[in-house]
């Protein structure tokens, strides 16, 4: 499709985001990012407010392929919204970006939005933030370690799980600390012990 495609054709691509077949959705948003990125991005951000779950989830997936272009607009959308569903969708879009582009440099504004999401009143937003930070990887390590040591058990379990495959020395030190602390929540402790065993097994295989 040529870059000069009409608005009508772009409207058709947005209609395709509501298609029940994920393949049709994927083809639509890949076409958007290739040929209509500037026109599509604002409309995709608006779709995060959509009541139709299929379209909203498709918008999250679509924003994931916009990578750097979507980072700052998503942060602005997150901070501006009073709707927990919209905020969760912004966070999930960050997870999609990080999953699609491993090692991508996340700007300070986006990291600040994810950190704010950790303290969101909505449990869905808060847990989604941990999962997104897990996708971000090493850049998010300090935040994830804070969450592991935090008082929110559900978030701590999610953070430990996100870091379970890491053999970074700071992660190992945190897990060892949690495994011996009397105040560690039983569910967190169980996850930590399992993760330490996984790291030990990984090191044995690599030896």
List PLM regions with ranges:
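Structural detector for internal amphipathic alpha-helices that build alpha-solenoid repeat scaffolds
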Residues: 1-6, 23-37, 46, 56-69, ...
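HEAT/HEAT-like alpha-solenoid repeats
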Residues: 9, 54, 106-111, 154
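Residue-level signal for cytosolic alpha-helical hairpin/rod architecture
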Residues: 10-11, 25-26, 41, 71-72, ...
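Short inter-helical turns and helix N-cap capping residues of alpha-solenoid HEAT/ARM repeat scaffolds
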Residues: 20-21, 51-52, 82-83, 121-122, ...
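Buried hydrophobic core positions in alpha-solenoid tandem helical repeats
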Residues: 12-14, 43-45, 74-75, 113-115, ...
